[in-house]
């Protein structure tokens, strides 16, 4: 029997199958890409409203450089409580309502507690380990604990004598030399913070550590300015040598970093050595933490403590200075408020003694004046930006991961629907209610896990200065050569911390008895 011819391989079937499979795969891939693009487009369409965005650059050319909170407030009247900006691909979400801020930054704080990465202030100038700049994590939580356990409501009473002594020295200094107003405010607030934090006594305006502290604060303010530094827009520049043309900012950052790290180590080491030998004032934050460690403080704990202490110093300095200057400016523009506040002090405290922080609960109008100072010219009008760690949805709007979240504190505290005549300084708007005042401080001192850990300590400093000034002096305008009173304009800087500019006045003692009481109260605390 003849063998049958071999059957040729059936090449056509597998080829057809492979072609069909490739076609299905290609169609599936295209469909997936289409779905992805449609989803991305849908997300983009569902983002919060905002100003028109140009292709590629978005809103980069529209971003305000001067007093951005005012521009954002105007946009809020058009786009609502939350709006979206795109600056060269960087997502920015601006929150203009306390209700929205509470929902996102408080209730959803697990994903809204990050910080945007800023190359200039962090990588280059070296402020990245301070609480205000750190991403949310273990070290930040540890630093906040170290501050909170020393400056809590149960412990701050031990520092009242320091705050009161500095307030009285401040007033005497301005009485003697009105031109020293800003210098006296800076020196005495620094004295309070450095004594409480490090046990270090500031010896005067020429004190080396005081001078370095002010310089560190000023450098932080410069380095953190948004939209100013090329390195923040092109982070790769941090790897370039500072001698290259056009990169002089890198050289400045090197100097800022050196000053920061050198001073941080020096003042911490001073505290450690002098707390042990009894030279430093006790208690102080650093010494208290080290004492609790009972000689077993790790290097990691000491580094966290060193940066936590520096945060209290630099973070407390500029915001407290801002608030006191705002208060003084308000008293110059609203003398009737000043008279009413003085009348309350006279009725409650009398003229036989100087007011104390312990009088605070009996002085609701003074508390209202302070709350109104926080509201009228908030120290941080855009707070400090948060960063969103995950995609999120709010009220049907898509908020993308990596967004910079900017709480527009200025608008929240100047919304005419909540605060009628928002540009007017009116302590009466609170009706003496601490609940209403707390609504202001809850906004002015930050949100969620990023709220100021030194709030109660700062309150004592501000109250002590405000009540001491009002009890003993009239805040009056300076007089020019023609006998005309010069009331300073309401002008302020464009920085992370708003600070009134060119505030000049005279502290005129209300009586010789008041001035004598100030002089007699000077003790060895400072």
UniProtKB/Swiss-Prot annotation:
Biological or metabolic pathway of the protein: Secondary metabolite biosynthesis
GO molecular function: heme binding; iron ion binding; monooxygenase activity; oxidoreductase activity, acting on paired donors, with incorporation or reduction of molecular oxygen
Primary localization: membrane
Annotated transmembrane regions: 15-35
Localization terms from the record: Membrane
Coiled-coil stretches noted in the UniProt entry, renumbered to this chain: none
Cofactor: heme
Alphabetical keyword list: Glycoprotein, Heme, Iron, Membrane, Metal-binding, Monooxygenase, Oxidoreductase, Transmembrane, Transmembrane helix
Mode of membrane association: Single-pass membrane protein
List of residues binding heme: 452
Sites where a glycan is attached: 219, 277, 320
Enzyme Commission number(s) of this protein: 1.-.-.-
One term under GO cellular component: membrane
Top EC class for this record: oxidoreductase
Alphabetical list of CDD domains matching this protein: CYP64-like
Function recorded in the entry: Cytochrome P450 monooxygenase that is able to use anthracene, carbazole and phenanthrene as substrates for oxidation. These multifunctional properties against a series of polycyclic aromatic hydrocarbons (PAHs) suggest that CYP226 would play important roles, at least in part, in fungal metabolic systems involved in xenobiotic detoxification.
Family: Belongs to the cytochrome P450 family.
Protein name, per record: Cytochrome P450 monooxygenase 226
Native species: Postia placenta (strain ATCC 44394 / Madison 698-R) (Brown rot fungus)
